[in-house]
Amino acid sequence: MEARRARQKALKVKNLKDVRYMKLISMETSSSSDDSCDSFASDNFANTRLQLNREGCRTRSQCRHSGPLRVAMKFPARNTRRAASKKAAPPKPSESSANDSHSDSEEEEEEEEEEDGMNFLEKRALNIKQNKAMLAKLMSELESFPGLFSGRHSLPGHRAKDSKSPRRRTFPGVATRRNPERRTRPLTRSRSRILGSLGALPTEEEEEEEEEEEDKYMLVRQRKSMDSYMNDDDVPRSRRPGSMTLPHIIRPVEEVTEEEIRNICSNSREKIYNRSLGSTCHQCRQKTTDTKTNCRNPDCWGIRGQFCGPCLRNRYGEEVKDALLDPNWHCPPCRGICNCSFCRQRDGRCATGVLVYLAKYHGFGNVHAYLKSLKQEFEMQA
């Protein structure tokens, strides 16, 4: 049995070898495409194709690569731009050559700038010379006209130091302004209601007469124009509360607490400003949180009766604590002795400013006492 199988196997190998070394016979046929396909599909075609391939290949590597037709194509490189730029870039010069070229260029630029500067200065000098010549020519032509300069043959220049400045042109009925001393008050809306029109203002001659002698009692002297400037129809502003005035509330002494007394300020450094919760002082017009006075006059209104500690002491020589504990205390405006800028302006007097230091210099403890003494001296001289 085994011998039979060995014979069959040897026969198959022999048949394969015969097919392998069989020569390929070329055939030409004029059959149609269907017939040719049938002939290619026959058994002998596969064997002949295999035999043809075997004969053409001498080595195994050649047989492995046998297959469909391949065409070799050349594709462009990816970094063509970089390569081109590298090729086009010139070689870097050495450091010494770069420094030499840089220094040469700097020297050339400096030389060009110097030449430009020299040319500019020359052109400037030439232009100045031409302008002066043209100006002299024009002036000579102008001087040839008779009566043009009325005897003045020089160019208008700066005034001499010793020459006096001409007097300002004044208009009748209009007050002139003088610096640094200004004696004429500005015509404000509140003052225009009292003085009336501009025609009633003092003339310049009257003001010069007043300035001849020093006004020693300017702070206490009431302006003499108050009575003479007023017409029959002019009525000074009435002292009555307006529609927006806060109602006056009289607080009894029993309602004053110890905390309010401790909250009284003795100097201006202790003040705390608060525009929402603070109360306004009639003298300094500052809205602070410290305790103010309360006027016990039923005819008082608004904030007229509110004074802070420093203002009441320096201006009138009184204390806020004593005013709060006095049931009959009236504020300075109600007594007619208020020396704030608003009340003095309403009475026709100038504002005092910070007068407390001058009052203390003359030996007075407050501004009211100093003004009172000046008023007495003025009345005695009058």
Curated annotation (Swiss-Prot):
It is found in: Nucleus; Cytoplasm. The keyword Transcription applies. The modification Phosphothreonine is found at residues 170, 203. Pfam families: zf-4CXXC_R1. The lineage of its organism: Eukaryota, Metazoa, Chordata, Craniata, Vertebrata. Transgenic mice overexpress Cdca7 in both T- and B-cell compartments. At 1 year of age, they exhibit elevated incidence of lymphomas, significant increased frequency of solid tumors and a 2-fold increased risk of lymphoid malignancies compared to their littermates. Interacts with MYC (via C-terminus), YWHAE and YWHAZ. This is Cell division cycle-associated protein 7. Residues 105-117, 203-215 have a biased composition (Acidic residues). There is a cross-link at residue 216 (Glycyl lysine isopeptide (Lys-Gly) (interchain with G-Cter in SUMO2)). A motif (Nuclear localization signal) lies at residues 167-183. Residues 152-177 are annotated as: Interaction with MYC.
